[in-house]
Amino acid sequence: MAEQKRDYYEVLGITPDADQSEIKKAFRKLAKKYHPDRNNAPDAAKIFAEINEANDVLSNPKKRANYDKYGFDGVDGEPAFNFQADVFQSFFEEIAKSGVFNNQTNPEQKEKKKRYHWFSKKPKQEQPEINLDHVVEQTIKKVQQNQNQNKDPDELRSKVPGEVTASDWEALVGDTRYGYFDETGDWSWKGYFDEQGKWVWNEPVDSETSEVSVEPEPTPVAPEASFEEAQPEINAEPEASFESTPTPEPVAPEASFEEAQPEPTPIPEPIPTPVQVQPLLLDLNLFTIPTKATKDDLLFDNINLTTYEQVVDYLNSQATPNLAKTDGELQTIDGTNPLLLEQCKKIKKQAEQLFKKLFLKKQLPFITQPEVVEESKTSFDENNVNLVYFEKVPEILFINQQPKEVKYTRQVFDGLTNKTTSETITLEIQLLQTPKETVSAIFKGFGNDHGKGCGDLKIVFEKIKSPFFQVNEDGLHSACIIDPLVAYNGGIIDVFGPYTNFQVKVDGEIDINAIMKFEKLGIAKTKRKGDLFVHLYYSSVPKKKLTTNPQVQQFLELLQAEYELLQDNIKSLKYFKNNLVIPKKPLDQQSYQYLSQEPIS
């Protein structure tokens, strides 16, 4: 089993919001400490390579942006240097050039060097002493130069000879015109760079500097995400215990037809192709990522979000001393992803245009507006709610009963410093299939803390209706566009289930508006609603020769875009699980919180 990597920020001992100067400072300090020539520990070389790997990613704006968004998956495909070959070699080259260790390990060579200076006819010039700190600085510069070779030409700003800017500060280390090495071996500057990047001397000198405008760095571009069809495995720390639903054996779809006319005509049973069904339903626990203020507040275990009742064990910890009523104003956070919302609108618009070509309305005939469901009367006490999290979620996540990651920031008052700080909390909430358009839950003690106790957090999820699926009393309903020639002569058609599509071979003479029934391929975890009903609609234009019907192909692409919404959520969960930190101490309390939902009859 491969050893799990440590978080790059943890390796360098910095926070995720650290700037480039802090990253360089941390790298220099750790590189000097764990360099194999100075540290004889068995794992020094391994730690040194780990430090350089973290610096290689975090010091590169593009790689750092990808790592912050996708974790190790975002940088695994990026070209990287060989740590053993490049980093150590660069250190040894600088050491060899400087002669730091030669003078210490070879007295004869040192004596020869002295005699050479004694008999040299050239006047003796004062040379700055080069120590290991300077070697580390030069190695940082060389590694960053290697990184610059992979950058776009537009990112590399050309320098005018003799021009000094703030971005050149590394090249000036060791230049006695701009600084000197003190008695401790540290480099001291004779001036500084102002906010405009202009060099300013500490004392008046006869040197002119020109002001240069620094171009802003380009915004990092995230790599285009690609999602696999199969469900990714979710790994956790050994201390974490995640319960997952056992995967049933693959079941081949048994298709039968039901006619919409009063007198149905018997149709031969189609021969389905073998299909491996891998349910995407996950039964996972609820955890929060520990921060400085919430480390003692992780009192959650065995979360089971399968009922509409609310049960709460009040939390008592250093982070939440009490749950008294707070005086803070109500704060609302909109966690809706604007890109996801725009993608859902685009899918719906293109689907409506296709339905019009099929002589249908703006939606499929079997999709109807759900009946208004009255809010269930719960024991929710919203008097202490001072933080509301709202997010629009695609309906396909509810249909597949997916966990949903909720990441928000709250305000926490520190009684020791009398200051209010911000902390980020990540919750994972199980979504359930429900006729409601909106579901909500209240989490005690997860709101803002203004000094008089932590308030409560209210989470509200609103469905983004799917134009292709609907859950009715008898099961899950979807659609299929079929070419008229295939319907008459028979062939292979694409059928769409709750989380993937599969191909089925059908015989000819299929009437329009026929219904195919697939047992146990609907929504899992239910017995009465476990079937899938596929409504067949003719395309308005037939295919030409051996080409694919354009309307059938367009419908397939739209459904694939709908499935990508589901795969995107799964990928986000995988990243969350891989970076999950679980406290090693046994949990002495539990807190159970359930979504407010009507029971499914």
From Swiss-Prot:
Start-end of Pro residues biased regions: 263-272
Domain J: 5-77
Molecular function in Gene Ontology: unfolded protein binding
Top-level division of the source organism's lineage: Bacteria
Segments for region (Disordered): 143-163, 205-272
Gene Ontology CC: one annotated term: cytoplasm
Keywords for the protein's UniProt record, in alphabetical order: Chaperone
Pfam families: DnaJ, DnaJ_C, EAGR_box
UniProt record, GO biological process: chaperone cofactor-dependent protein refolding; protein refolding
Listed name of the protein: DnaJ-like protein MG200
UniProt-listed NCBIfam families: EAGR_box
Compositionally biased intervals (Basic and acidic residues): 151-160
